[in-house]
Structure formats: C-alpha cells, structure tokens
Design a protein with these regions (language model features):
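Trp/Phe/Arg-rich N-terminal binding region typifying the photolyase-homology
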Residues: 1-162
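A charged, amphipathic alpha-helical module
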Residues: 1-34, 150-257
C-alpha cells in the first residue's frame, strides 16, 4: 500500500494552527509512518500501534464544514456526523487527510451512512461494535479485533506480533494511568485548577504521537500542580458542572469557558 505523503492543494488557505498540524503529519509520513484514523474510543488502537502506525481521533466538533457536508447528507442529520464528513470531504482535517486507513464502527445509522460515502474516496474499514454487554457480544468483539488485525497485516504487508501488541497495550495503559491520576487531583476542594485547564491537557494528549513520553510529562505536570496547590493561595470554591458525552470538545466546551 502506498502511503499518502503530499499536502492537499488548499493547504495555503488554512489557519496557522491547522497548517502546523498538517506539517506535523507530513513529517511522520516522510518517515514512512502509516497513520490510522478512527471515530470511536472503542477503536483498538493498540493493534495499529503494534505494526508501527500512528493512531489519531477524527471526530469533528466544529460546525465549520457542515454546509459542505449538507451537499451530500440530510440537513436534519446529527451535527457531529455532518461536521466529521465535511472536514473529510473538503480535505480540511490534517488527520483525516493523512490517514492511510480510516476505521469506523456501527454505533449509529448516521455514521454508518457516513462511512459508506467516505468509502468512495478513502480506505475505510468498519468494525461491528456490539451494543450490549454479554458473552456473545464479547465473542463478537474479539472476532472483530482479530479480523481488523488481519486486515492491517494484508493492507500494509506486515506481521503484527503478540509481543508488539503487548508492548502497545502496556504503553497505552501507562498513558491511561497517568491521565487518571491527573484527573483525580480534582477531588481536592477547592479544586487546584479549573475544568477547562484539565480538559485542555486530557484532550491535547490524544494528539500526541510520541505516546511513550506522555506518562512522564503528565506525571510531572500533576506533581507541579499539587506542589503549587499546597504552597500558593487556593482558588475560590465554585459550583462544579459535569459535562458528559463523546466527543466533548469544541462547541460543548463553551460551557467550560463561560465558567472559567
């Protein structure tokens, strides 16, 4: 499979941060690093990482490209689906553009239709995600993961070994533990930082491609936060608002910014 390395024609029209993201991805591709994009947190990224690929989330939370998407999709469809499709079809998302394979899943009818249309201009692999928790569902999901592994091996002409899968699992577990420990500093009352600051760290960590460095940096950040919390004046107590859902970035974070 030939990796995508060229920049899109509309590159020069992008804002500075988006240009930076494109160039970061371009550097990876120039080193022959495959990129696998996904739209669901259930995506078994460790399987892709075990073959040396970089993984990245693709769900869009900006309404910028919804008008583009509505040329193909119904106006009353989910905004997240339309935004994601709009960024994909317009080449405005650096992560989608440089993804050699996009992994979808059967979480909703809107996304299934989106993947169908995306398949006309991108390599799309759809995983059957069970919608219940049972022995049968677990068996199905295990089979789906093994099928995905075989697909990557055939597509990229590589062998994904158990040893490399275990290494990837260990690395991602270290990431999750570090992020969980950071999240738990918010148990303090008053909180040592506002929710927007915490979210920026959690969300930004998803777009770090040097995953092996993330735990150490997150742990160092946690220590710094706690040291300053003990030594400096505390923030005033405020009401706490719980934001849930996935994805929770972009437009939903207006609530967080409004209460900083």
């Amino acid at each position: 499979m030939e990796l995508i390395k060229a920049l899109p024609e509309i590159f020069e029209d992008f804002a500075e941060q988006r240009k930076k993201s494109f160039l970061t991805m371009k550097e990876l591709k120039d080193r022959d690093v495959p990129v696998v994009g996904a739209y669901c947190t259930y995506f078994p990224q460790e399987i892709a990482m075990a073959m040396g690929a970089v993984t990245v989330g693709l769900c869009s939370t900006s309404d910028e490209t919804i008008p583009v998407a509505e040329k193909d999709l119904p106006r009353n469809l989910c905004p997240m689906v339309k935004a994601s499709y709009g960024f994909a079809v317009s080449d405005k998302c650096p992560f989608f553009y440089f993804s050699d394979v996009v992994v979808g899943e059967t979480t909703c009818d809107g996304k299934k239709k989106m993947y169908e249309l995306m398949g006309e201009f991108k390599n799309v692999y759809v995983m059957e995600l069970p919608n219940s928790q049972s022995e049968t569902a677990l068996k199905l999901w295990k089979e789906e993961i093994l099928k995905f592994k075989s697909y990557l091996e055939q597509t990229f002409k590589v062998e994904i070994t158990e040893e490399n899968v275990r290494k990837a699992v260990h690395m991602m577990n270290e990431n999750r533990i570090a992020l969980k420990n950071l999240y738990e500093v918010m148990k303090k009352d008053p909180a040592p930082m506002n929710g927007q600051e915490l979210f920026n760290v959690l969300y930004g960590s998803q777009f770090r491609f040097d995953k092996e460095k993330v735990p150490e940096e997150i742990n160092a950040l946690r220590e710094k936060i706690m040291k300053e919390y003990e030594e400096n004046e505390k923030m005033p107590k405020k009401k706490r608002i719980l934001l849930t859902g996935c994805p929770s970035s972009g437009a939903p974070m207006k609530i967080g910014r409004a209460h900083v």
